[in-house]
Amino acid sequence: SVAGWPIAHEWKRPESYPVPASWLEAIMAGHETIEKDVALECPVLSMVSTSAYFDEEWSERAFVSDTVLDPVVIAQRSLNLSNMVTIARFPGKHDLVLSDAPVREAVYDTMLGWLAAFVK
């Protein structure tokens, strides 16, 4: 099993980067393209958090939830990407590989198992 590496929190900025309008436009255009025009002919692995947390008030739930995107929507839309889609859910953050070690281990185990099963 793989748990990844120790996370160097000191390397992460305390504040977020500014988000230019052009970046958000590109994201929205990409979402539209994926939603309407993508039909992959290969297996797809979609890994998402088990929950979302969007409240303005701080909560420990932020450590085990996606605070950026709705994992339910991601999972639903993932199903339209290909005829062979695997959805894997983990009680982790938006960036699953930055979640706590047990979640990272499960994420890597799932990813490696999926690769062994579907990628030749």
Question: What are these model-derived regions, one by one?
Answer:
Residues 2, 6-9, 71, 82, ...:
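Amphipathic, alpha-helical segments enriched in basic
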